[in-house]
From Swiss-Prot:
Gene3D superfamilies: 3.40.1280.10, tRNA(m1g37)methyltransferase, domain 2. GO terms for cellular component: cytosol. It holds the Pfam family tRNA_m1G_MT. It is found in: Cytoplasm. GO terms for molecular function: tRNA (guanine(37)-N1)-methyltransferase activity. It comes from the Bacteria. Belongs to the RNA methyltransferase TrmD family. This is tRNA (guanine-N(1)-)-methyltransferase. The gene is trmD. It catalyses: guanosine(37) in tRNA + S-adenosyl-L-methionine = N(1)-methylguanosine(37) in tRNA + S-adenosyl-L-homocysteine + H(+). HAMAP family: TrmD. Its EC number is 2.1.1.228. Keywords: Cytoplasm, Methyltransferase, S-adenosyl-L-methionine, Transferase, tRNA processing.
Length: 239
C-alpha cells in the first residue's frame, strides 16, 4: 500500500515509524510519503486566508493543496479529507480502506477549507463529534487502524478478526499467567480445555459487554438463534 499525506507538520507523524506500522514499512508492505503543502504555497508561502463574505478564523487556501496534490505520483487513489463534518470512521471503514493500493490524506488546520479543495476528494471522514486542532492525529489513527488489516502485516489474520468491532461485537475478556493474581483468578472455563464451552463463554461475554457498554451496536447486528438465547438471558439477569 502507498500512502501520501498532505500536511503542514510532517514531524507529527514520527509515531508511524514504530510498532506495527513501522514494521509494515520495514517489510516493504507499506510506503508512506509526507508532503508539506506550505512548500508549494504562493503568496509568500501563506497557506491560509480570510473567508469571502466575512466570518471568524482563516481558511486553508486551495492553491497549495492542488499544487501539492498534482505533484504526487498516483494512479487511482482514495483521497481522504479529514473533516469534523465528514462520515464517522469505524472498523468497517478501516476494512474497506485496507483493500486499497493508494491512499491520500489531506490534513487541514485553521477554521476550515476552501470548498474547492473537496473536488479532489473521494471521502470526507471524521473521527467523532469533536474538533481537533488539525487533521494529523485523525490521519494517524485511521492509518494505524487500516494498516494492521493489510494481509501479512499481523502474523495471524485471526488476531485482528477477534478484535472488538471486527465481529460486530465488543471483544470478550482475556487472561494470561498467573492463574491467581492478588486474589483475582482466571475463570475456570478457560482452564478446562473444553473448546466448545470456551467458545460459548467468549460469545456470551462479548454479547454481555456489548449490551452493557454499546447497546447501539446490537441494533445493526444480526443475531443467531444461539445469540438471541444468550442475550435474553443477559437481559433477564440484569433485571
Amino acid at each position: 500500500m502507498k500512502i501520501d499525506i498532505l500536511t503542514l507538520f510532517p514531524e507529527m507523524f514520527s509515531p508511524l515509524e514504530h510498532s506495527i506500522v513501522g514494521k509494515a514499512r520495514e517489510k516493504g508492505l507499506l510506503d508512506i510519503q509526507y508532503h508539506n503543502f506550505r512548500e508549494n504555497a504562493e503568496k509568500a508561502r501563506h497557506v491560509d486566508d480570510e473567508p469571502y463574505g466575512g466570518g471568524q478564523g482563516m481558511l486553508l487556501r486551495a492553491q497549495p493543496i492542488f499544487d501539492s496534490f498534482d505533484a504526487i505520483e498516483k494512479k487511482n487513489p482514495r483521497v481522504i479529507l479529514l473533516d469534523p463534518a465528514g462520515k464517522q470512521f469505524d472498523q468497517v471503514y478501516a476494512e474497506d480502506l485496507a483493500q486499497e493500493e493508494e491512499l491520500i490524506f489531506i490534513c487541514g488546520h485553521y477554521e476550515g477549507y476552501d470548498e474547492r479543495i473537496k473536488t479532489l476528494v473521494t471521502d470526507e471522514i471524521s473521527l467523532g463529534d469533536y474538533v481537533l486542532t488539525g487533521g494529523e492525529l485523525a490521519a494517524m489513527t485511521m492509518i494505524d487502524a487500516t494498516v494492521r488489516l493489510i494481509p501479512e502485516v499481523i502474523g495471524k489474520e485471526s488476531s485482528h478478526q477477534d478484535d472488538s468491532f471486527s465481529s460486530g461485537l465488543l471483544e470478550y475478556p482475556q487472561y494470561t499467567r498467573p492463574y491467581d493474581y492478588r486474589g483475582m483468578v482466571v475463570p475456570d472455563v478457560l482452564m478446562s480445555g473444553h473448546h466448545e464451552k470456551i467458545r460459548q463463554w467468549r460469545l456470551y461475554e462479548s454479547l454481555k459487554k456489548t449490551y452493557e457498554r454499546r447497546p447501539d451496536l446490537l441494533e445493526h447486528y444480526q443475531l443467531t438463534v444461539e445469540e438471541e438465547k444468550m442475550l435474553a438471558e443477559i437481559k433477564e439477569n440484569k433485571e
